[in-house]
Swiss-Prot record:
Entry-linked InterPro entries: SAM-dependent_MTases_sf (IPR029063), UbiE/COQ5_MeTrFase (IPR004033), UbiE/COQ5_MeTrFase_CS (IPR023576)
Originating organism: Bacteroides thetaiotaomicron (strain ATCC 29148 / DSM 2079 / JCM 5827 / CCUG 10774 / NCTC 10582 / VPI-5482 / E50)
Protein's recorded name: Demethylmenaquinone methyltransferase
Gene Ontology molecular function terms on file: demethylmenaquinone methyltransferase activity; methyltransferase activity
SUPFAM superfamilies, per database record: S-adenosyl-L-methionine-dependent methyltransferases
Taxonomic superkingdom: Bacteria
Pfam families tied to this protein: Ubie_methyltran (PF01209)
């Protein structure tokens, strides 16, 4: 199926969205962590903890963190869940290089590894992982259905999927406040801290049109997952989706 965010590209150039997303994240990798925590006022850490708390009872030993970026979620998941193996995948080597340094400093290089992967064409075998996580990256998929289908393919039967994604609040006054914040504050801070003006216009543009709530639940369900649920966090600014294969 065709989704609006798939046509939004960071630099509005001809060519594949994936290539532009890769270039964008390579460009902002040096400032990404600072921006992420600043723009969310640090609340993103609590969102990650809620996602990991949902996984904890299942004790997954082999985890893939898709769109791992600089490895924030991977590091926290490794510390909290203590899996045998955690592979962070991303298309941006710039982001993963930052992640590799962080993992080394944390002393987790024996548990966490990184691999350059296109989420719509994963190189892993079927039924490979106990759990798959995606934190704030699924909006960037060039083909949402294909990406979800690939994650379902490499997840073991009975395995679990956890997605965190930024969403638009649907109630007054947060809806109006978030609209102003995303239209004015996010692009301004993004330009000041990352020096990439396009990246932080792209972010609110994709949040606005990305499937959310019941619609996203349906998208996940049709790609092979069951027991799909969602929970809105912090007045709907973020949504946690969970599913089982």
């Amino acid at each position: 199926m065709d989704y609006p965010q798939q046509h939004i590209k960071p630099y509005n150039e001809d060519g594949k969205k994936t290539e532009q997303v890769e270039r964008m994240f390579d460009n902002i990798a040096h400032a990404y962590d600072k921006l992420n925590h600043t723009l969310s006022l640090g609340i993103d850490r609590s969102w990650r903890r809620k996602a990991i708390a949902w996984l904890r009872p299942f004790r997954p030993q082999h985890i893939m963190d898709v769109a791992t970026g600089t490895g924030d979620f991977a590091i926290l998941a490794c510390r909290e869940l203590n899996p045998d193996e955690l592979i962070g995948t991303d298309i941006s080597e710039g982001m993963m290089n930052v992640g590799r340094e962080k993992v080394k400093k944390e002393g987790l290089s024996d548990k966490i590894s990184f691999a350059r992967e296109d989420c719509t064409s994963l190189s892993f075998a079927d039924n490979r992982f106990d759990a798959i996580t995606v934190a704030f990256g699924i909006r960037n998929f060039e083909d949402l259905d294909k990406g979800l289908s690939e994650m379902c393919r490499v997840l073991k039967p009975g395995g679990h999927l956890v997605i965190l994604e930024l969403t638009t609040p649907d109630r007054f006054p947060m809806k109006q406040l978030f609209a102003i914040y995303s239209k004015v504050v996010i692009p301004l801070l993004g330009k000041l801290l990352s020096k990439d003006n396009s990246a932080y216009h792209y972010l609110p543009d994709t949040i606005k049109v990305f499937p959310q709530g019941e619609v996203m639940k349906g998208v996940i369900s049709k790609t092979g997952f069951g027991e799909v649920h969602f929970r809105r966090l912090t007045f709907g600014i973020c949504t946690l989706y969970t599913a089982t294969k």
